[in-house]
């Protein structure tokens, strides 16, 4: 069924991040978000990404997918629940004086995995 996996699925997104290096996550994850928002179907999220990225990125991917699935009323795949919280909090913006804001604003499915982003993290133009 590999050939049926959409190009911008979370499975393929994680493959691209691995291939291009973990610092490439923003480009690939935001491409996934755009594609999923345009066509929110389970096809984009049902195949678990290979667990070959850092725990930070796996938690970020799971939090992103879970939040978008809830927003669009798409079934949450079981692989998402298997991604554990980080042992240390990750402030994605990494700007010291904005940590308090991301503590306040971070959506619940990010926060529960120890990831702190701004409220507009998933907002795309």
Feature map (PLM): residue ranges:
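Generic hydrophobic secondary-structure signal
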Residues: 1, 29, 33, 61, ...
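Charge-dense, extended regions
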Residues: 75-125
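Charged, helix-prone or intrinsically disordered regulatory segments positioned adjacent to compact structured domains
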Residues: 2-81
